[in-house]
A protein has these predicted regions:
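Bacterial N-terminal signal peptides
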Residues: 3-14
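Short glycine/proline- and aromatic-enriched beta-strand/turn motifs that initiate or cap beta-hairpins
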Residues: 16-60, 172, 177-192
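Short loop/turn motifs that connect adjacent beta-strands in outer-membrane beta-barrel proteins
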Residues: 19-26, 60-72, 106-112, 148-154, ...
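Residues on the lipid-exposed face of transmembrane beta-strands in outer-membrane beta-barrel proteins
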Residues: 31-35, 51-57, 98-105, 117-121, ...
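Residues that define the transmembrane beta-barrel architecture of outer-membrane proteins
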Residues: 25-27, 45-51, 90-97, 111, ...
């Protein structure tokens, strides 16, 4: 954990001036990696590591009052790397999240917090969890923040992920995990 915090501090300390924050008509491009472990509510003893690419469209100007003030963004994620470390095997897979609903709160200095709901599909070489199916769906919720920099931003978030085959196979116990995700990206404004 100390190493992770040291890397985050080093990565964010190289940014001196603030870049464009999420704005209506702007776009987000990001590469990210994350990982975590299963929690109660499904099959346990499973670790998850994943990495992907994001493209987002900021659709609205700022609205709502007070601390809720922010902008709505729609995003898609391509996930070329997905590993599920299960007690009996390691499943390798790919995923695609075509539904990313993100609320970018009003920025405070270089910090731009956000909430996100995401949904998509996961295809693996082994059943996830074991004895179920190789085709699954992913529902996710995340709370994070962008640290805006001169050329790029660093994103850090806490993500809850539910993986389930949605009844395509029986049984359908699913896997629930809590993950930490780190991303490096850029917001492009309307005029970039």
């Amino acid at each position: 954990m100390r190493s992770f915090l040291a890397v985050m501090l080093l990565a964010t300390s190289t940014f001196v001036t603030a870049q464009a924050a999420p704005e209506k008509g702007g776009h987000e491009v990001q590469i990210w990696a994350g990982g975590g472990h299963s929690v109660s509510g499904g099959r346990g003893q499973t670790g998850v590591v994943n990495a992907g690419l994001r493209y987002g469209w900021v659709l609205t100007d700022s609205h709502l009052p007070g601390f809720l003030r922010g902008r709505f963004e729609y995003a898609v994620d391509a996930i070329p790397v997905f590993l599920a470390f299960q007690p009996t095997n390691t499943a390798y897979g790919v995923g695609f999240d075509p539904l990313g609903l993100k609320w970018n709160f009003q920025r405070h200095g270089r910090i731009s917090p956000y909430l996100e709901l995401t949904g998509g599909v996961l295809l693996t070489n082994h059943d996830v969890p074991r004895g179920t199916n190789t085709v699954n769906f992913m529902d996710q919720a995340a709370l994070g923040m962008h640290v805006l920099g001169a050329k790029h931003n660093v994103s850090l978030e806490l993500r809850y992920m539910h993986i389930s085959n949605a009844g395509l196979a029986t049984p359908n116990p699913g896997i629930n995990s809590v993950q930490v995700r780190l991303g490096i990206g850029k917001f492009f404004g309307r005029h970039d």
